[in-house]
Amino acid sequence: VKLGVVVPIELGHSGDPEWILEFARTAEKLGFDEISAVEHSVVVSNTGSAYPYSPTGKSHLPDDCDLPDPLELLSFVAGATTDLGLATGVLVLPNHHPVVLAKRLATLDRLSRGRVRICLGLGWMREEIEACGGDFDRRGKIADEAIAVMRALWAGTGPAGVDFDGEFFAFRGAHSWPKPHRETGVPLYIGGHSAAAARRAGRLGDGFQPLGLAGEDLDRAIGQMRRAAEAAGRDPGAVELVLGATLPRLDEARMDRARKLGAGRMVLSASPKAGSLSRVVDEMAACAERLGRV
């Protein structure tokens, strides 16, 4: 099982270059496979949208918390590391035009020599998506087409370019270079907590990252993903399952449970009370030692 660590944005310093490099280099040194960056293009004060991962419906982040663009952050980290994977968790797909996003992801993957893993989400904050020009109510249908656009542009190498004629996006003779480092393109995972996210992962995703789910809810989502994959003529086992945990609580017993569920990767967060980068580093080091990574 591969292990990633989420950038602890709640500490408020992820826009500091020395801070983020210390975090990333420490993760690489300790044997973690990747770091994962989150996204909010804007945060809207007093949003009317309920945050789905808290019983209060409110995000734990203050409005003025540093939230760097995840792809720019990962590009910065790529140049200062050698083998560390570069992931998002999640990139809010409705905030991005897929033609532009395809170029950005391909460039990052090419320059990092294939270290990129993108987990896409549809977002929960209506005001954020609408501020970016997105259609909140139709974002699921648009996302399906956006994924097809990106993969078509990455695969298109012929002299005539790429034609695409969809409901939301259309172009003819389009050339988008450089291509991703990997011929199969940048891996696109689907993150979310809804049945729609699970089904989308089964139909279209290279992986599924269920967010905020445990117990029967998690089992149900995994089943929904696998049934959707089968219905689409895909091998459910080819859709990598990514599970979450906190750094202090992960041990071999939890790893074994993740393996039994079919997980190939785990994404780990610092404890809510970590409070500082030095404490996060201590949690990372202790986790790596428990699991024999160092």
What are these regions (language model features)?
Residues 1-294:
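Active-site-adjacent structural elements that line small-molecule/cofactor binding pockets in enzymes
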